[in-house]
Amino acid sequence: MRRLQFLSLLLLFAVSSFGDNKFTENFESSLPSSAPSSETAVSLASGQWKIKGVCGKSDNGSLRLSMSGNGYAVTPTLCQPGQVTFSHRASGSGKKLKVEKSTDNGQTWQEIGTATVSSSTPYGSSSFKCNSQEADTEVLIRFTCMSATIYIDDITITLNSVSQEQPDIDDPTYITEGAWVPTKPFPTAVKEIYLAPDGAPNGDGTFERPWNDLQQAINAATPGTHIICRGGTYYPKKQSDSKYTVRIKNSGTEQAPIIIRAYDGEKPIFDFVNQLYDQMVGDRGLLITGNHWWLFGLHITHAADNGIKLEGSHNRIERCEFSYNLDTGLQLGFGHKFSDTFPGVSENDGSYCAYNDIIDCDSHHNCDYDANYGSDADGFACKMHNGKGNRFIRCRAWHNSDDGWDLFETDFDVVLAECWQWESGKAADHLWVKDYITKSGNMSFSGNGNGIKLGGNGTGGSSKGVHYAFNCIAFGNNISSSVKGFDCNNHKDGHVLVGCLAFDNSYDYMFESGGSDANTKYYNNVCLGRQEIGVGYDDYNAIAVAMSKNGWTNHLVTNVSQDDYLSLDEDEAMKPRDIYGGLPRKFGRLTYDSQMIDAGSSTFEESMEVWQQLVSDFPFLQRTIQGKSRDLGPYESSYSATTGITTVNDSPAAAPCRKVMRNARIVIEKNGNYYNTQGQKIVD
């Protein structure tokens, strides 16, 4: 379990030495006169830095930090850095200097900005926001020279240390201000193309003279291009085929993907409302058949079919939103018959529509409209002959007309990790389609209303592969007595469910007999309602009331309820993500006295290659266990199962902390002072 950290207390005196809540360095002394070829620690006026490929040189009468190609300099540890400002000059024009931060002692880095540096005199300057959160108390900042030679000087970094006494905050966990940060840094752009809603086709795609046509930018893109979209609403233009669909046919490379991304701090919306006429139903918003694309921060709405249909491979769709489309928000795969898409190829060998990652995306209020409307549109789908290696990471789907996720007619394994789904199949959510589309005859709503549907058989054959759901949540799917939260849907090849939670569904879990016992496993899951388990092996799960048959049995915790959670309210589930894409931090978390704390086992995840690859690629998925065992369900609590007491940083000299009630709230008491769960001192 994750211990409460009080680094703000431990860093109080160290941070105060920077003075005026700022960190400064002007490189006037102690830099080597020649650049070291390996990482070297140097003591400067501001503290110990780490450098490689940089040295001190006189420029315009003052010492500067001189950086050769790929040289870098790393600051000392900083507490909650805010604005990073510095001066710069280069040996030529168009040089690039990347600025990154690390919150894990340099194991991983997140780009916060890239400066374009010229040879102008006097020095230019750049300023980037770190967007620190309250837990970011040990942060490193790295400056990297992407093209030699660059001089930097006069670095100033504001510090927003939580070591200062601050009043308690009722709900500090939903930080939405600031530019969104991708889960890994964008690679350096080879070329940049700018779009803006008020741009023009006769512009040149620069920041000053942007285009406004996404298709125009895509056609001009080559590997390494960044298409940067300013905020506002775009209405895609009719193309030469008389359709509004934006087609992505060209490809990037593994090292140089083509990126379409939101301009920092802004949200571009691509509204395909011009498709919403009877004769255009079936036209998609974006159709991606190319490979190695990365879409970040886009909102796709009002497409006459899928918001995005993804058929290419090695693509990354991140922080995108899909809403009010006339079919599934984001769909991977082809059609019922694979050879219809690839004549002469009878089946997918795994390389088509393969290795795509869908990360931190939201999909809601999508609904198809025909004679039996609502029966096809899901939040997300990977179906009809997908390839290998497709994953959904930390996505949400709600209020879609059919299902939240649909893995119908799959050909290979599909993985879901920390995904949330709720309230599918409610007709009242989808009256909006009648404002746009008119159909003759008696229209009836036919949404199935299932949550996470992990399989399905149709005219294109039976679904194949072992499907995985790690730490996922499904709730509120109950439009009839037969709908389910997690549903095998007659899939026979097997499932692995670890750390999932289901409640308020007609059936929380439905896994019928006839599937693969050897490939079906349930570990550390929680069921607050009904289940029907007819296949597979189970261990370390929890249920409200044990089933007399067709239910979990081994190491089973019973008599659990919604009272075991801080919140299971939809309003909490819908709250904004943080700037890093993280989901709301109250929903689905256990209370301090839940019997599900320390009641599970981490052995299963640790032995699974699929899970180990996930946490290697996405370290934020890792569940850090510091108690005696894993908690049941999706999230680890910060409480001890036996005493409710945690210690600070495992220090033998540290005073114990206690969780106590104060003013009807749980707070932390230490040495007579009170702190909230962010480590901030509560001031009366």
What are these language model-derived features?
Residues 551-641:
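C-terminal accessory segments
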